[in-house]
Amino acid sequence: MNDLKLLRSKLSTETIEELYKNLNLLKKELFNLRFQQALGELKNTSRFSLVKKSIARIKTELTKRSNSEEY
């Protein structure tokens, strides 16, 4: 739980460019995980949910910032 608070505070301090950079890296990692799973090489399947949740957190932060800039 404490790690989640640290992650959220880290996301709120990153710039938009850094967030997009991290988002692209996570999407590439998710693609690689899917590729490994298709080949039967993936050992740690729980990594899927962690990467997907991280992508969702970054997208949420980006949406929050874009909505706050509109007003």
Swiss-Prot record:
Q: Which GO terms describe its cellular component?
A: cytosolic large ribosomal subunit
From the UniProt annotation, give the residues forming the signal peptide.
Answer: none
Query: Which superkingdom?
Result: Bacteria
| InterPro entries noted in UniProt | Ribosomal_protein_uL29 (IPR050063), Ribosomal_uL29 (IPR001854), Ribosomal_uL29_CS (IPR018254), Ribosomal_uL29_sf (IPR036049)
For this protein, the record's Pfam families field holds: Ribosomal_L29
CDD domains in the cross-refs: Ribosomal_L29_HIP
GO terms for molecular function, please? structural constituent of ribosome
Which sequence ranges form a coiled-coil region, renumbered to this chain? none
Which BP terms does GO give this entry? translation
Q: What are the UniProt keywords, alphabetically?
A: Ribonucleoprotein, Ribosomal protein
Q: Which PANTHER family match?
A: 60S RIBOSOMAL PROTEIN L35/50S RIBOSOMAL PROTEIN L29, LARGE RIBOSOMAL SUBUNIT PROTEIN UL29C
What HAMAP family does the entry give? Ribosomal_uL29 (MF_00374)
Spell out the family assignment given in the record's similarity comment: Belongs to the universal ribosomal protein uL29 family.
Stated name of the protein: Large ribosomal subunit protein uL29
Record the organism: Rickettsia prowazekii (strain Madrid E)
What's the encoding gene here? rpmC
